[in-house]
A protein has these predicted regions:
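RNase H-like nuclease fold core
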Residues: 1-62, 66, 159, 180
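A short hydrophobic/aromatic micro-motif that marks alpha-helical segments and, especially, helix-coil
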Residues: 19, 34, 94, 195-197
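Conserved beta-strand -> loop -> alpha-helix junction used to position metal-binding or nucleic-acid-contacting
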Residues: 55-101
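Acidic/histidine-rich catalytic cores and adjacent linkers
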Residues: 51-62, 68, 102-213
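Short, surface-exposed beta-strand-loop junctions and turns on beta-sheet-rich folds
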Residues: 22, 72-74, 194
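Glycine-rich loops and low-complexity Gly/Arg-rich segments
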Residues: 25-29, 39-43, 51-55, 80-83, ...
């Protein structure tokens, strides 16, 4: 199962649960903002209908994993790469950033042991660099000089336990990305964009009709 949320404007979004095996959206609901409770309600609704969620692919939103803590959880590789890219940019200037970006490029082709070893070696090499501090002359307070690099590394370390779940349970055929749902979201937004002049009620009907097919 893949669970994700997309927004069409600040307060107009949809949470969707999709079965890659069935190639079908099994649950969707309009929401004003993304919350943990909406994921919980979605799971409850599906199980009430008789569906069994054997595993879930998520984008890494904090707290959502608790809703699915009793089943295998896969962190979407695409979203993990996006997180790192957001901190490092596409062209990191620091050598440490370039090397970390290179490690992330092995995410989809490696395994947990190999990836962990690469990450551990990188940290061992750059540990002192990551701990460098800068003093704010105006306030006298210090901050980590390479805060964005630290955040990129920390995201990988935090999500490591969920990045290779799909290899640990081959019998479940778990995708390693939310791409099948993201592709639907992209097409949906393009279609809704064509009908920009429609009011929210009509847009909602169009979106629900598309998601149900």
């Amino acid at each position: 199962m893949i669970g994700d949320v997309t927004f069409f404007n600040r307060w107009f979004g949809f949470i969707v649960f999709r079965s890659p095996a069935l190639k079908k959206n099994l649950y969707f609901k309009q929401i004003p903002y993304e919350t943990i409770s909406e994921y919980s309600l979605g799971r409850y609704a599906l199980e009430k209908q008789g569906f069994t969620i054997s595993a879930i692919v998520l984008d890494g939103r904090p707290g959502v994993r608790k809703v699915f803590s009793d089943i295998p959880i896969q962190m979407c590789h695409f979203h993990q790469k996006q997180i790192v890219r957001r901190y490092l940019t596409n062209k990191p200037k620091l050598e440490a950033g370039v090397e970390l970006k290179e490690i992330v490029s092995y995410l989809c082709t490696g395994n947990k042991e190999d990836f962990t070893q690469r990450l551990d070696k990188w940290y061992e090499k750059w540990e002192s660099f990551l701990k460098e501090r800068t003093i704010d002359k105006a306030t006298g307070h210090w901050f980590y000089t390479h805060g964005r690099l630290r955040s990129a590394y920390r995201s990988l370390r935090t999500n490591l336990s969920y990045l290779f779940t799909y290899l640990e349970y081959p019998e479940l055929n778990i995708p390693n990305t939310t791409n099948s749902l993201d592709g639907s979201f992209k097409n949906l937004k393009e279609l809704v964009g064509i009908h920009r002049g429609f009011n929210s009620t009509l847009k909602k009907k169009i979106i629900e009709e598309i998601l149900s097919n």
